[in-house]
Curated annotation (Swiss-Prot):
Protein name stated in the entry: Unguisins hydrolase ungD'
The keyword Hydrolase appears for this protein: yes
Source species taxonomy: Eukaryota, Fungi, Dikarya, Ascomycota, Pezizomycotina
Function description: Hydrolase; part of the gene cluster that mediates the biosynthesis of the unguisins, gamma-aminobutyric acid (GABA)-containing fungal cyclic heptapeptides with the amino acid sequence cyclo-(D-Ala1-D-Val2-L-Leu3-beta-MePhe4-D-Ala5-D-Trp6-GABA7) for unguisin H and cyclo-(D-Ala1-D-Ala2-L-Leu3-beta-MePhe4-D-Ala5-D-Trp6-GABA7) for unguisin I. Within the pathway, the hydrolase ungD' catalyzes the hydrolysis between the D-tryptophan and GABA residues of unguisins H and I to produce the corresponding linear peptides.
Record organism: Aspergillus campestris (strain IBT 28561)
GO molecular function, one term: hydrolase activity
Gene of this entry: ungD'
Pathway membership, UniProt: Secondary metabolite biosynthesis
């Protein structure tokens, strides 16, 4: 679809097509769709391949849009805040616990009683990501929103509320559950009723089943493997537990409609107060070049000043896909990209978004920020961090280091934490390799345990498209066998590891006290869990 007035220049011209090709080649991305909204005009176009080897991307191609879903969640909550007839109890400053009661309990009593709707939507609850704590099996059934929300009580915060920006998918899962609890409806139906249908967004879905049932072309997500080289398909998965935090599937046409409605403040979607609320800054966020003023997070939107104009934006990344949406409200201008690789789609999308913004703002070519180089440097730093992990985490270990106390195969078993759930550690005897596979979690990952010294290990954490190295430690019980394992799964907690207790160990109650029953909600997690202080 290309719609424009006669005197409008097409920003998605042949010159831009060449820039897109170079960028996709640079980042090894099969395909991308792009939309530009400029006042009354909208342009959309597809580039490259939606599915290898020969299915082209078109403006109708569906992509997972990741965390850009959060904006729909905030928008719906703004409608409930406005609706004083049906939801008089729902205001931005309403404590979430007043609405969800025992389902929403945090590790500190003050937090439980005071964290508000506004707080959970602006990443200022004090709760870090805890990205590996949810999904998978919950007592024999797949994770529900309620399961995940109730598990939050067992997760430690890393800062006092309202002091620090900490991005949290978890809190948007809480927001999704809140919407379903208040409305009595599945959040996907609420999105469709309140936002998508009024805007004519008839190609936007919140489940893979619905997207497939539509009969519309769905892009395949990929992971580029430089060692082959080649592309590995990333399995398309339905992740209902991600919900309003990042489960949307849409195409570039529909996202152009969404961007247009936001720029025009369409009265058939949100109220004037609602539009103001979702874009009003709440939390100061880290900034970097080329931004020279403080950045902030509003309600599911980032706000920054660039070249003298305010940009409101958000990105979205999920296994095999990446989306960028950026709006300049003062100019009625927006750019959206959707592509089909993990991480690199966001790198390329950002570079192309700012290429078009720079053209709109007449920024001289020699004054434009090199986003491709910035992301290449970031990738290099992450690889260096993996390479240097042993020295970073264990700088004083002698060489040669003492071997593990036990044969590697003796560290296997089922380990458990009330929030992070079960971790089954296995031994590959042929390769003498200790590992765990959490492929069914919301963030699928594999952990490989590399011995460093005695019970101290490094864990190679592999997720789709990336890897990291984390310190880990086993603790031996009185009988000389492993009783628990600690992994630095949440870096925001500093040196505090997440401790998982080995199944069947009698020290379990001593470690977790009375918080084992996830349905009881009677005790909070200790501020820190140090079974043994070294």
């Amino acid at each position: 679809m290309i719609s424009k007035t006669e005197d409008s220049g097409d920003p998605l011209d042949q010159d831009f097509a060449e820039v897109v090709k170079q960028t996709l080649d640079r980042w090894h991305i099969p395909g991308m769709s792009v939309a530009v909204v400029d006042g009354p005009d909208t342009w959309t176009k597809g580039y490259g391949l939606a599915q290898l080897p020969n299915t082209n991307v078109t403006p109708d191609t569906l992509f997972y849009t990741g965390s850009t879903t959060k904006a729909f969640t905030a928008a719906v909550l703004s409608l409930l805040v406005d609706d004083n007839k049906n939801y008089p109890q729902v205001q931005w400053n309403t404590p979430v616990n007043q609405l969800l009661r025992d389902d929403f309990v945090l590790s500190h009593e003050w937090d439980t009683n005071n964290i508000t709707i506004e707080d959970i939507l602006s990443h200022r609850t004090g709760m870090p990501r805890h990205e590996f704590a949810f999904g998978g099996d919950y007592d024999g059934h797949p994770a529900s929103l309620r399961d995940i929300v109730r598990s939050v009580r067992y997760m430690q915060r890393s800062a006092p509320p309202r002091t620090t920006y900490q991005y949290s998918n978890l809190m948007f899962i809480v927001a999704s559950y809140l919407i379903e609890t208040l409305t009595g409806k599945w959040i996907g139906d609420v999105f469709r009723e309140k936002i998508w249908r009024p805007l004519g967004m008839d190609s936007t879905y919140l489940s893979l089943e619905d997207a497939r049932a539509s009969g519309k072309e769905l892009a395949q997500g990929y992971l580029y493997n430089s060692s082959l080289p080649g592309y590995e398909p990333v399995p398309l998965k339905n992740k209902p537990e991600v919900s309003g935090a990042g489960a949307a599937i849409s195409n570039i046409k529909d996202y152009a409609k969404w961007a247009t409605a936001l720029l025009k403040r369409a009265p058939d979607v949100l109220s004037p107060a609602g539009y103001s609320a979702i874009w009003s800054a709440r939390t100061v966020t880290p900034t970097h070049d080329p931004f020279i003023t403080p950045s902030a997070y509003a309600l599911a939107w980032n706000t920054q000043v660039y070249q003298g104009v305010e940009i409101v934006w958000h990105d979205g990344g999920i296994d095999g896909f990446g989306t960028e949406i950026a709006l300049i409200p003062s100019l009625g201008f927006a750019v959206v990209t959707q592509a089909n690789t993990t991480y690199s789609s966001n790198y390329a999308g950002t570079a192309l978004v700012y290429h078009l913004i720079d053209k709109k703002l007449d920024v001289a070519p020699d004054k434009r920020f090199d986003w491709n180089k910035w992301y290449e440097d970031l990738e290099r730093q992450m690889k260096e961090a993996v390479k240097n992990a042993r020295q970073t985490f264990y700088p004083t270990v002698p060489s040669p280091a003492p071997p593990p106390t036990l044969p590697i195969g003796k560290y296997t078993g089922n380990y458990w934490h009330p929030a992070y759930r079960q971790l089954t550690i296995l031994w590959d005897e042929e390769r003498n390799l200790l590992y765990a596979d959490r492929k069914d979690s919301t963030t699928p990952c594999q952990l490989t345990f590399i011995p460093v010294s005695r019970e101290f290990f490094l864990v190679r954490l592999t997720v789709v498209g990336a890897e990291a190295m984390l310190p880990a430690e086993f603790r031996l019980g009185p009988d000389g066998t492993p009783s628990m394992v600690g992994i630095l799964w949440e870096p925001s907690l500093g040196d505090e590891k997440i401790w998982l207790k080995k199944e069947g160990d009698t020290h379990f109650k001593e470690m977790y006290g009375g918080i084992v029953d996830s349905t009881a909600g009677k005790k909070r997690v200790p501020d820190t869990i140090h079974p043994i202080d070294l």
